[in-house]
Amino acid sequence: MKYTALIVTFNRLGKLKKTVEETLKLEFTNIVIVNNGSTDGTQAWLSSIVDTRVIVLTLTENTGGAGGFKTGSQYICEQLASDWVFFYDDDAYPYPDTLKSFSQLDKRGCRVFSGLVKDPQGKPCPMNMPFSRVPTSLGDTVRYLRYPGEFIPEANRSMLVQTVSFVGMVIHRDLLTTSLEHIHEQLFIYFDDLYFGYQLSLAGEKIMYSPELLFYHDVSIQGKLIAPEWKVYYLCRNLILSKKIFQ
């Protein structure tokens, strides 16, 4: 199997260096890094990397996470002979055994997986947990606030879910190729991954949450601005305002 890492970065050179360092230790066939118009010396540093697995795509402006992941996905689908693509940000990376764990998974009937993303304290990152059931109404949102366990998977139990996070998603290249249109650049940042995963679910794809696929995410805070309740509110609002996306 050929595995490709897809990383999007913007003006976080310090964290990117650690992400690349850890990624280079893993047996990826290719490592695609999308430089989203960084102005902090990122391009010069990326140009100094000598590992031939690394492919740098440089954009002239910041197109957001959605634009960066779409650019990288298009390149991978058109130019690389890869089987599976691992998505993550410039402040995240897979654990040392994640690729081995993925190779041992039963992939029959499933072309997209969502891993368990942990913060620096070793706790699950709420912002990267998928929804086992998307709250698409006001009633669902209220119930989610009271009973979140009805809408998100248990951290350490494999189960089917309805969304993904672009930190910790592993997707088959064939499925990615036919689903590029569902990475919506206009969303820029936040919810692009939720929309993408939910569209896959609506199309009948099985998304498996697999906690044995561990990712590290160097998030310094888990405050209100990135709490799941905040994401749910805007997700529901955007689902209502953007129904055409799912037609």
Q: Where are the language model's segments positioned?
A:
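A conserved acidic beta->alpha catalytic loop
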Residues: 35-44, 61, 92-93
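Short, flexible, basic/aromatic active-site loop/helix in glycosyltransferases
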Residues: 133-162
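Short, well-formed alpha-helical segments that are part of the catalytic scaffolds
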Residues: 12-25
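Conserved donor NDP-sugar-binding/catalytic core segment of glycosyltransferases
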Residues: 97-128
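A short, conserved alpha-helix in the catalytic core of glycosyltransferases
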Residues: 163-164, 168-213
